[in-house]
Amino acid sequence: MKRTVISSSNAYASKRSRLDIEHDFEQYHSLNKKYYPRPITRTGANQFNNKSRAKPMEIVEKLQKKQKTSFENVSTVMHWFRNDLRLYDNVGLYKSVALFQQLRQKNAKAKLYAVYVINEDDWRAHMDSGWKLMFIMGALKNLQQSLAELHIPLLLWEFHTPKSTLSNSKEFVEFFKEKCMNVSSGTGTIITANIEYQTDELYRDIRLLENEDHRLQLKYYHDSCIVAPGLITTDRGTNYSVFTPWYKKWVLYVNNYKKSTSEICHLHIIEPLKYNETFELKPFQYSLPDEFLQYIPKSKWCLPDVSEEAALSRLKDFLGTKSSKYNNEKDMLYLGGTSGLSVYITTGRISTRLIVNQAFQSCNGQIMSKALKDNSSTQNFIKEVAWRDFYRHCMCNWPYTSMGMPYRLDTLDIKWENNPVAFEKWCTGNTGIPIVDAIMRKLLYTGYINNRSRMITASFLSKNLLIDWRWGERWFMKHLIDGDSSSNVGGWGFCSSTGIDAQPYFRVFNMDIQAKKYDPQMIFVKQWVPELISSENKRPENYPKPLVDLKHSRERALKVYKDAM
């Protein structure tokens, strides 16, 4: 373990503070061998492309087609919450209530439950951030209270084994089935759940489907995408790997299934009833272990309001006061020009269908202009929501992108420099490039940076420092409160020119131009790099020299990329 001391500004106090972080930086250099002892190879990845290996999403859909719902000897219906921690417009929860009401007609003693399953090994393997986990735990407590008003108990199950075990294992299947049997007293249970599109999660669901029997029936639903993966294809029936034509088809699809003149998406709303006659609220006994929080400065814990109502309120405020300025302000580093909804979307506290519905009402019923360049601010906001769908669609079609591999397999030949000292300086905001350092320090202190910030720092790491983009992708996942694997991998692939619909390899962000364009008065930089407050264009002695010369490092990157591609 290496101790790194970072000097940075404090966003919530006027004076400079120091932050001690004890951190193992080597964990970002590769997949965790404890969980992935045999990582996928280029050959293995190509098996998905040449169809010699079935894609997990295809397997899930194939298994589900064989299913038939039976209420015989069933006493319990249960919704399994995952990244959908909400009541309003939740497809799986809505279906669970509908199945329960059907079951009640046959069995008056039937029960309706909800469950959330904790597997700390999944969190470790997937590098979920402490910021995000704190938000999730707060959201679960709030969700439990909301469900209590409906007399629906929310159970919290913890999966532990003597050895490190992911949820896509036979041990988890046995654990899950046993837990369900305990709740239903040995009778049948119907489980509803919304699909998660990462490869590990899909293989977990495949194992469960392959092991279901008359005592356990599983029903999986598409929920996190406005348009489910696989429904948008080219005229030849293939999957899009470029966003713009996909987006135009996405808009066409959404418009074709428009619910009404005021709502473009169908929402799934459950009735506010008392679903169980007897009900007892049992507080959770789980506390987040310190290992997930030790690299976060406790004095800086300032989480957003975790409630579902807060998400809805934030959407209303954004559309009412800020969305009209979105085009001009979303990239500015010193302004809060974004919606602030990303953590609510990632954890499922708000549905993207609801977001698009509300935004649709603000743009005269047109979610896209005839010419994309003429998109209004609100239309471009909707387009950003569509990007999330796009990256999920891509992850389903190219599953190896959630297995530590780039979409463009030829970029595996790039000869990265992978300087560990330079990587640590990038992580801790000590590169000597003010805009990069300000962004990275803000990430450490708050768990959030906007999309422009992510693009700037990703370009600098992969192009100017020539460090494998996957190191940075893992760092972001471990530190972002809104970390979403498909969007994170997609964004890093774009900036490093290794991914889907990526920028050309010869496009390298100029850090000076980025700073002048998105922080022209150095308001943001001076907030997070206080060493520069009184520098008067001179580099202060207590601020590091640049790790690289921007011009020379750009030329080096072009040569290395060209040699590989």
Curated annotation (Swiss-Prot):
General remark: There are only 150-300 molecules of photolyase per yeast cell.
Cofactor binding note from Swiss-Prot or TrEMBL: Binds 1 FAD per subunit.
Record: residues binding FAD: 326, 338-342, 482-484
UniProt subunit comment: Monomer.
Consequence when changing residue 517 to A: Reduces substrate binding 10-fold
Residues binding DNA: 514
Protein name as it appears in the record: Deoxyribodipyrimidine photo-lyase, mitochondrial
Enzyme class: lyase
Species, as recorded: Saccharomyces cerevisiae (strain ATCC 204508 / S288c) (Baker's yeast)
Chief site of localization: nucleus
Physiological role: Involved in repair of UV radiation-induced DNA damage. Catalyzes the light-dependent monomerization (300-600 nm) of cyclobutyl pyrimidine dimers (in cis-syn configuration), which are formed between adjacent bases on the same DNA strand upon exposure to ultraviolet radiation.
EC number: 4.1.99.3
An annotated Gene Ontology molecular function: mRNA binding
Domain Photolyase/cryptochrome alpha/beta: 75-226
